[in-house]
A protein has these predicted regions:
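Conserved, mostly hydrophobic/aromatic
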Residues: 5, 15, 94
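Active-site pocket-lining segments that scaffold enzyme catalytic pockets across diverse folds
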Residues: 1-7, 11
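Alpha-amylase-like alpha-glycosidases and glucanotransferases acting on alpha-linked glucans and related
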Residues: 20-132
Length: 132
């Protein structure tokens, strides 16, 4: 499809969401990439803290990455993910880019995002690996 579009002067922009779903193939095939307990339940999940728009914050529920594991693997999963998207799209946009700098975690099982904490993400190190 990309070649067909490109041959007609059309460029395709595609999105990569920063997080995958708990019940995704990525999470179940690669549990070591995520902060899961021994029963494969998330230890914490993604979201946003309360703000002027919502007193409860945003509880997205996606599992949180084990960034230390990703770092030890030189971010190989992320590199494969981005490279695959480069085949499909001319421009790749990563949704919630800020989450690579800092991300908000909520203990698994909470019904809102009032209780949570900001943690440091991989930062520019991940993108240096992607660029290699």
């Amino acid at each position: 499809m990309k070649k067909y579009a490109n041959d007609r002067g059309i460029r395709i922009i595609g999105d990569i969401p920063i997080y995958v779903a708990f019940d995704s193939a990525d999470a179940w095939m690669n549990p070591e990439l995520f902060a899961f307990d021994e029963d494969m339940n998330p230890i914490e999940v993604a979201g946003c803290p309360p703000d002027g728009f919502t007193a409860d914050g945003q509880l997205w529920g996606n599992p949180i990455y084990d960034w230390e594991y990703h770092k030890k693997q030189n971010y190989a999963w992320w590199i494969r993910r981005i490279r695959h998207c480069e085949v499909l799209y001319d421009v790749v946009r990563i949704d919630h880019f800020r989450g690579f700098d800092e991300y908000y975690t909520i203990p698994y099982g909470m019904t809102n995002a009032r209780i949570g904490e900001w943690k440091k993400g991989p930062g520019i190190a991940l993108f240096h690996e992607v660029k290699k």
